[in-house]
Swiss-Prot record:
<dbReference type="InterPro" id="IPR008979">
    <property type="entry name" value="Galactose-bd-like_sf"/>
</dbReference>
<dbReference type="InterPro" id="IPR027421">
    <property type="entry name" value="DNA_pol_lamdba_lyase_dom_sf"/>
</dbReference>
<dbReference type="GO" id="GO:0000727">
    <property type="term" value="P:double-strand break repair via break-induced replication"/>
</dbReference>
<dbReference type="InterPro" id="IPR042530">
    <property type="entry name" value="EME1/EME2_C"/>
</dbReference>
<dbReference type="InterPro" id="IPR047416">
    <property type="entry name" value="XPF_nuclease_Mus81"/>
</dbReference>
<keyword id="KW-0479">Metal-binding</keyword>
<dbReference type="InterPro" id="IPR006166">
    <property type="entry name" value="ERCC4_domain"/>
</dbReference>
<dbReference type="GO" id="GO:0008821">
    <property type="term" value="F:crossover junction DNA endonuclease activity"/>
</dbReference>
<keyword id="KW-0540">Nuclease</keyword>
<feature type="region of interest" description="Disordered">
    <location>
        <begin position="298"/>
        <end position="318"/>
    </location>
</feature>
<dbReference type="Pfam" id="PF02732">
    <property type="entry name" value="ERCC4"/>
</dbReference>
<dbReference type="InterPro" id="IPR011335">
    <property type="entry name" value="Restrct_endonuc-II-like"/>
</dbReference>
<dbReference type="GO" id="GO:0006265">
    <property type="term" value="P:DNA topological change"/>
</dbReference>
<dbReference type="InterPro" id="IPR047417">
    <property type="entry name" value="WH_MUS81"/>
</dbReference>
<dbReference type="GO" id="GO:0003677">
    <property type="term" value="F:DNA binding"/>
</dbReference>
<keyword id="KW-0464">Manganese</keyword>
<dbReference type="GO" id="GO:0005634">
    <property type="term" value="C:nucleus"/>
</dbReference>
Amino acid sequence: MLPDNLKDLYVQWLQELIDSLSEKQEQLINTYSKAKKNLIDHDGVFYYPKDLLKVKGIGATIAKRLEARLVKHCEEIGVDVPRKQLPIDNGTQGSKSLKRVRTQLRIDGINTNDTDINKPVRKKRKYIPKKRSGAYAILLALLELGAQNKGVIKPDIIEAAQKYTDHSMTPNYTTKEFYSAWSSIAQLKKHELVLIEGRPQQYTLTEEGLQLADTLRLADGIDIDGKSIASSMDTNNAYYSDEHTADFSALKHDLSGLTCAPIKDGTNSSGNYSILEKTFGSQDFNVRHHEIGMVQRSHTFGNGDSNNSIEPLPRDTSEFTTQPSLIQRRRFESVSYELWQPGTYEIYPVIDHREVRSHSDREFFFNAFKARDMKSEIRQLSLGDIIWVAKNKTTGQQCILNTIIERKRLDDLAMSIRDNRFMEQKNRLEKSGCKHKYYLIEETIGSSIGNMADALKTTLWIILVYYRFSMIRTVNAEDSVDKLHALHTVICESYKHKALVVLYPTDLKSQDHYRGILSIFQNEFERSGNLECCHTFDTFQDIMGKRELKTIKEITIHILMLVRGVSLEKAVFIQRHFPTLNHLLNAYRKCNSQMEAKLMMFQKFGNAPGAKKITKQLSEKLAETFAF
């Protein structure tokens, strides 16, 4: 049987809590000691655990711990746990009294479901987006694009959704409108109305999202083409031909061991035709057994008759049999791609919205290009300051060309060297896959570069000689515009007779994967100079951003670079010997003394070549960061 006042027990259990703490938990010891002292000094009866809350220094956490100790004590002696009884409702109490009872029960932690008071369960309100809002427009756009059957990319959704909303679906950086109605996609994802998959990201309506979108369409009388828009989505655009799902990399493997009979005109045939010629040589090209029989399965050229010979496929892309209004789509190495013929696309530069002349002249480059009758566009770029794109005149789809520019003033370059941004940007530029990477160096100085003159000279030589980047040196922003206009003229001329192979990967894992797929296509298709392989602009934006999911290796390197004095070269060199932070921490734990830990990095990498060398001072700093 429990005594009428449990104060002594509560004091005893508080002392047990204090005794269970270690010396390092000094703050908790002080907290519990004050609570114990205040409880001893407080007059009154303490029976229920909730009664302890009126003591200064005892809050919900301490009360819960003492309540748990009370439950354990009651189980040991075989008695019921004290619970506050409900006041008897004799019918004279009104609704306000009933509310007070429920409130008191909630405070006391008593489950009202076990009482005669049935608390109504509040039904969760169904999420319905406001009419003409961003979420409303996105749902209707996904319904219109048939996104219940196939994923849709962000630009297609934005284009289709704009007519359903009163707000802009795209940010306007020139007017400092950095947010748009597209941000409502987060709410749709939260309420499981939209599913996001793949990289670049593709958006699909869930079953609930499809029902809600159709309800909104019917409620507002919106007329969407009744035909299943999935049929148009299967081709991604009304201008696309049906995609052949056969993987032509398998065809390449099948044909690799085959040789052709002599050609009638006696020309040399190496059988080394590109997959592009095989796939786009005819719209009716099919991989069938009887067609493979056209070639002889022999390692030497036979002397077969004319019936066994085949004609060489055309080398010039202009000879490919394509319809001007139809874009063909094929697959290679499980990646879809399209062929854009010369003349079916326009070329212009895209300028990063942060690339300005000054805070008061944010559209300098755009206006300067416009004055020279040169089209350009301002966007937020994931990488680079200026990049050239090709835009299909029929579909409006954009792809990234092989030219990217990083613009730097001398003082900005000096600061990027000092805080390691230069090496990080250089590394990302290499992963972009662009063959022509330029550093545009403006020799204007907005602030003092201090003692960075020698470092700048070294960096400029490294850019040219070691990293093989091209460099454009200008006097000021006006001179930069002239040089960029001249470069644009050269780029347009070089693509006048060039066809583009535009890639559409659906599940890129990383920036290295992005570059690897591009290299595979370049090795296969760019054997002649009249073709160029490239990713879409949307893929570039999604993959090349700094927010890309990093591997453990990249995270380790990034953390090492947070230590002042550790450059990218040093971080990469350290990571090769300590693959993860766990390896590094274990190495420090094995040191027998603090002095050994301080000298560990110096002893390992003190004689490393060049920029990889770890000095004694840097070794001590690393030990202070990771060992102590």
